[in-house]
A protein has these predicted regions:
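Small cysteine-rich, disulfide-bonded extracellular modules of the LU/uPAR three-finger superfamily
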Residues: 1-91, 99-128
């Protein structure tokens, strides 16, 4: 992971419990959340923290469409923001969300403005 992304402490706690207690299986990734609070006033991505439990300014969540495995320790989640959603919004933060609604990884990036009539397809890699 780069400096603008983080695996949350919530995810690391859940991994620890799942590895040591069969009564606590790991919740699967079901959604990707998008937001507009991932940059500073100069437009540079800010570093997310492992203790974050929410995006700084969440705009929407979308269900994961597919998962691929580009290598044996990476799960790549694909999600599409539809043409009619988030028109005119600047997207600069994203998070993987598990089936319990917890943010498990956060990535901040440069702003991408969503145009009318255009769908955005995002890929988010979960690297182990």
């Amino acid at each position: 992971m780069n400096e603008n992304s983080v695996i949350t402490k919530t995810r690391r706690r859940k991994l620890c419990m799942a590895a040591s207690d069969p009564e606590k299986p790991l919740a699967v990734i079901t959604h990707v959340a998008f937001g507009s609070g991932g940059v500073n006033v100069s437009g540079e991505p800010i570093v997310p923290t492992e203790t974050q439990t929410a995006l700084n300014s969440e705009l929407a969540r979308y269900e994961v469409e597919s998962v691929t495995y580009p290598d044996e320790t990476t799960a790549r989640y694909t999600v599409t923001i539809p043409k009619d959603s988030l028109v005119g919004k600047e997207i600069n933060e994203a998070a993987l969300v598990d089936s319990e609604g917890d943010l498990v990884a956060i990535k901040n990036m440069y702003s991408k403005k969503k145009d009318e009539g255009v769908s955005f397809t995002f890929e988010f890699d979960d690297e182990f």
